[in-house]
Amino acid sequence: MSVPAFIDVTEEDQAAELRAYLKSKGAEISEENSEGGLHIDLAQIIEACDVCLKDDDKDVESSMNSVVSLVLILETDKQEALIESLCEKLVKFREGERPSLRLQLLSNLFHGMDKSIPARYTVYCGLIKVAATCGAIIYIPTDLDQVRKWISDWNLSTEKKHIVLRLLYEALVDCKKSDEAAKVMVELLGSYTDDNASQARLDAHKCIVRALKDPKAFLLDHLLALKPVKFLEGELIHDLLTIFVSAKLSSYVKFYQNNKDFIDSLGLSHEQNMEKMRLLTFMGMAVDNKEISFDTIQQELQIGADEVEAFIIDAVKTKMVYCKIDQTQKRVVVSHSTHRTFGKQQWQQLYDTLNTWKQNLNKVKNSLYSISDA
């Protein structure tokens, strides 16, 4: 049976044709429109739309887009319940099947709505859920700046803000977008206050473990400032994070010897932890010393003499440290190293450097004026 073309008719006639179409597919629905108005008709149509979701993609898209278009012409106060019901149908129906079609329908609804309508939150959550089930997160908007703006535009409650950020984080993790996921998790944890930080205990724990696992994450001091992470002070997970933020390899080795079972329970690789701590330790050494002997590197990083040069090469590849190997003197000459932490002392150093540049530029400027006036 061909699908009716829902165009060039009144909203009431369109609803009646949808009713007739659903009825022909076996839905338990009257072919007569409700006396309660279009929003009642749509509530009944959405409730019965499961039968048409079993059709071919083209047929489903035609009929469901008709439903979407009718929902969008309603007054805002009548849309919310219908949108929630429609999203629930599209998210849950045969979960995992026909994801591209369900994403398309949800996307049509999302982009057809006024940008400031709070009900867009429900649709966006639906988009995230469907995208996560099929690895299609790249096909929906996930830019954190844009998500922040939507959260503000929709005037979301704290609870809903946490829900959407957590959904987005989990979807990005499932879709192997670790860098983006880490940023979203930091945003989520940063939205907690002293009053509700304890509620994010599990999220904070996950955030720390994921950061420690990430082979590209070396600067972790910003995590210590997050209130849910502060709430974990005194626990082993917080102690471990503190070691990765500012301590040396020897501190990690001692921690591991005393808490091997804990490290294993986190799913962390001791060997990977050792590799990361060697680099972090070397970064700290390079900040304080412009010349470092091979012997010192060997001792501090607990590696053999034949491993030093290979380690230096790998360290430079991370772009956390810039240095050259002086094989004659058996030393490393450092030109730059990234600070593991950026606190008051580092801000002062940055201020002093910028101020020096400013003074030098003023001298150059004055010299040029003197030459031009001569």
From Swiss-Prot:
For this protein, the record's Pfam families field holds: eIF3m_C_helix (PF18005), PCI (PF01399)
Q: Which UniProt keywords apply?
A: Cytoplasm, Initiation factor, Protein biosynthesis
Q: Which domain of life is it from?
A: Eukaryota
Keyword check for Cytoplasm: yes
Cross-referenced InterPro entries, in alphabetical order?
ARM-type_fold (IPR016024), COPS7/eIF3m (IPR045237), eIF3m (IPR027528), eIF3m_C_helix (IPR040750), PCI_dom (IPR000717), WH_DNA-bd_sf (IPR036390)
Residue ranges of every copy of the PCI domain listed in the record: 180-339
Subcellular localization is given as: Cytoplasm
Q: Does the keyword Cytoplasm apply?
A: yes
BP-aspect Gene Ontology terms: formation of cytoplasmic translation initiation complex
**GO MF annotations in UniProt:** translation initiation factor activity
GO cellular component terms, alphabetically, are:
eukaryotic 43S preinitiation complex; eukaryotic 48S preinitiation complex; eukaryotic translation initiation factor 3 complex, eIF3m
Could you describe the subunit structure of this protein?
A: Component of the eukaryotic translation initiation factor 3 (eIF-3) complex, which is composed of 13 subunits: eif3a, eif3b, eif3c, eif3d, eif3e, eif3f, eif3g, eif3h, eif3i, eif3j, eif3k, eif3l and eif3m.
**So what does this one do?**
Component of the eukaryotic translation initiation factor 3 (eIF-3) complex, which is involved in protein synthesis of a specialized repertoire of mRNAs and, together with other initiation factors, stimulates binding of mRNA and methionyl-tRNAi to the 40S ribosome. The eIF-3 complex specifically targets and initiates translation of a subset of mRNAs involved in cell proliferation.
Similarity section: Belongs to the eIF-3 subunit M family.
Which protein is depicted? Eukaryotic translation initiation factor 3 subunit M
